[in-house]
Amino acid sequence: MKKRILTILVPLFVAVLWLAGCKPEYTTYSGPNYILFSDTLYEMAVVDDSAYFNLPVVATRACDYDRNVAVEVIDAASNAIEGKHYSIESNSVVIKAGELVGNVRVKGYHSNISVYDSLGFKLQLIVPENAEWDLYGTTANVLV
């Protein structure tokens, strides 16, 4: 009786191990190509005047060409002053061919920020209308 149970269980165990060893199928995104900030709120802990922070700009699909995206500061929604409290390295971001991420590089000026300040600014991506995802939008708030 024990031999018969082992004869059934051993092949069953081997079959389970064989099936578990198969490569899983990964679900990939196949929808439209959108460009957006990876988050809608970023916090920069500015500790010196030389550190840069990367604010990721992401695309939902990789392309075989470079994508240039313009970045602008919305002054009406900002209380930090560009050039005094922070600076943006470039007003454009490049998402390179075959990649999904480009970065807006921002530097904060610690010497011009008081510990009592509550500063922030709002960024907006300038993208073609067909690359704008209505669900997430193209803006991000940055707290300094």
Spans of features found by a protein language model:
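Bacterial Sec-dependent N-terminal signal peptides
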Residues: 1-4, 14-47
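First exposed extracellular module after export/assembly in secreted or surface-exposed proteins
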Residues: 33-144
